[in-house]
Amino acid sequence: MNVTVDQSTLAGATRGIVRGGETLKEHRDRLMAATKATGRYAGLKTLELREREPILYNKLFSRLRAGVVDARETAKKIAASPIVEQEGELCFTLYNAAGDSLLTSTGIIIHVGTMGAAIKYMIENNWEANPGVHDKDIFCNNDSLIGNVHPCDIHTIVPIFWEGELIGWVGGVTHVIDTGAVGPGSMATGQVQRFGDGYSITCRKVGANDTLFRDWLHESQRMVRTTRYWMLDERTRIAGCHMIRKLVEEVVAEEGIEAYWKFAYEAVEHGRLGLQARIKAMTIPGTYRQVGFVDVPYAHEDVRVPSDFAKLDTIMHAPCEMTIRRDGTWRLDFEGSSRWGWHTYNAHQVSFTSGIWVMMTQTLIPSEMINDGAAYGTEFRLPKGTWMNPDDRRVAFSYSWHFLVSAWTALWRGLSRSYFGRGYLEEVNAGNANTSNWLQGGGFNQYDEIHAVNSFECAANGTGATAVQDGLSHAAAIWNPEGDMGDMEIWELAEPLVYLGRQIKASSGGSGKYRGGCGFESLRMVWNAKDWTMFFMGNGHISSDWGLMGGYPAASGYRFAAHKTNLKELIASGAEIPLGGDTDPENPTWDAMLPDAQIKRDKQAITTEEMFSDYDLYLNYMRGGPGFGDPLDREPQAVADDINGGYVLERFAGEVYGVVVRKGADGQYGVDEAGTAAARAQIRKDRLAKSVPVSEWMKGEREKILAKDAGTQVRQMFAASFKLGPRFEKDFRTFWSLPDSWTLPEEEIGVPTYGSRYSMDISELPDVHTVQFVEE
């Protein structure tokens, strides 16, 4: 197929803005029809430019890729928000005229797909005619109903023209501190519908002639709590987009529009072929099944929501069936996933499908050629009505990541089993950490301004272990592989919270032959804040990142907060006060130092806004990654080294690893080799003594299933999954040999089921045409 339009087909037609004269919709529809008919992007049977002029092709790639990375690094310095400047929470992507990405920068590359989804929505809904798409226009979007991850990711999108015709788009995204939601911070928890998610912008034209509209500036700054950060982050995005637009214009002027035009489409097909080749090289054909869970503990008194029907504990369910074929194609099917819920953890299909490439670029496709080709090379099935493909326009998305990171960790385990089978041991990953806790809140800050905070220290969690080495400690997040915990001094400038400690969170990484990387923890004291609130957000009752091949899960979360601490007087008197970290939460030391304080120490790791005053304490605990392999196979000296380094608590050396350690005169722990050998032999004997045949275990479990002997949350989860996933229910029945008379309707469980029978999709709104990206 020739991606350049045949001029003869346009005779008598209204001329569109795309190069060659097509309208945006005509252009995209033609490309998608050719893609569907041939299985190749845009019907490209050969990559003409790449094959005939490989030096020019690679020159274009190298120059443009370097340019988008340079734009990110330069724009990052404009940002005032530490989320952007410290953590690098931004990304720039270059798109062809059809809205498909051909190149992206480093950073939060999940937005390769989300900004593209916004462009495709504009194309599908004829933005070309109204409000119009012109050279030097500026568009803004954060609408999660059309593909964004959550409202705090703000897109700036700029069209690129050459000689009066549109040849592409460039998008920039930053994660902002506040979106004007019900609660302060970028990812509030108090709302249960999207109407409380904050400022919502649907591909709005906010500027022309490279100038933002005054009405937009006046409106947007008053819609959020953090006006200064909002305005400077917008300038960050615009600056990067304009740098990339200028680069494209220079490249076209030097290399010719024909070369650039071919590259803009061949690069996508190149990306698809690259993924297919890597799948063939690194995996084993077959069907892989795995599952992920995470808790939504909303029945607790410290979760205050406006609707009674949302006041219940539920569990997210994400079973994944991965099918790898001999030709290098593959299919990811999430049949059996639970329904969307009345909370802020739902996700759009694009955030689910686009986000997986953040991890894939670390293992499966470790290439700078990150674009929509990989998406075109993957078959996704996300059933309509599930939490990752909701069928109701009321759903909230504020913290989609709570479910996303917990669901994806299962996918990495499936891929890792395949890598392991092919011998790519260094690419094995036991799973990602649950990227939390999220310290958020707001009020009047130390500068007497209305403010909100969203600490991004959790951009540095532990990573999962591989099959050859331990995971990295306090190093990265699944949504930003280049994440950074940030400087304490910068966070103290942005937040009225003084650091009393920051240290490695011992034993937060999962145990194993290779240990998961540990997270870390920061103890913050409220100082010089007024009318201040904060809340917690993360996993607590469920460990969402399991280990692999005998490795242990990472530790789940908990909360520690202290009110009415009397710290002012304790400090004045020189008494001992909490400092450093909460090293062993089962044997706490801080609580005794604060005898009169109101302390909250429990597994309720999700709360809504809670009032805090000066001298109150808040522990921000970042999670670790899961482990790989049996802990009894770990080198004993590595366990001693972990204790000495603060990565493992001494009591777990014997309990988990079977390693006997002795403390030397120098205060360092060493290994008792003979004692260790005996301890490990005994643990193995104990395991055998406790074990039962699988058939016997299954018999007992089947009896529990027949009696419906499970917690309310578990029964509700499976009931919702059965209703949305009939094939999942059939497989479940077959596996457990259940009679036809056994049923599990939600109605018999005795919990509210609002949304399970009645829903209204966004596509039912007047003049709205959605874009479908997955099989539903």
Curated annotation (Swiss-Prot):
Q: Which family does it belong to?
A: Belongs to the oxoprolinase family.
Keyword annotations for this protein?
ATP-binding, Ligase, Nucleotide-binding
What does UniProt give as the signal peptide span? none
Q: How does it assemble?
A: Heterohexamer of two alpha, two beta and two gamma subunits.
Query: According to its UniProt entry, what is the function of this protein?
Result: Catalyzes the carboxylation of acetone to form acetoacetate. Has a reduced activity on butanone, and no activity on 2-pentatone, 3-pentatone, 2-hexanone, chloroacetone, pyruvate, phosphoenolpyruvate, acetaldehyde, propionaldehyde and propylene oxide.
Indicate yes or no for the key word Nucleotide-binding. yes
The record's top EC class is ligase
Record's superkingdom? Bacteria
Residue ranges annotated as transmembrane are none
The record's catalysed reaction(s) read:
acetone + hydrogencarbonate + 2 ATP + 3 H2O = acetoacetate + 2 AMP + 4 phosphate + 4 H(+)
* Protein name per UniProt: Acetone carboxylase alpha subunit
How is the polypeptide modified once translated? The N-terminus is blocked.
Gene Ontology terms for molecular function: acetone carboxylase activity; ATP binding
In terms of InterPro entries, this protein maps to:
Hydantoinase_B
User: Could you tell me the Gene Ontology terms of the biological process aspect for this record?
Assistant: cellular detoxification of acetone
User: How sensitive is activity to pH?
Assistant: Optimum pH is 7.6.
Q: What is its EC number?
A: 6.4.1.6
Names of required cofactors: Fe cation; Mg(2+); Zn(2+)
What does the note under cofactor report? Zn(2+). The heterohexamer contains tightly bound iron, manganese and zinc ions.
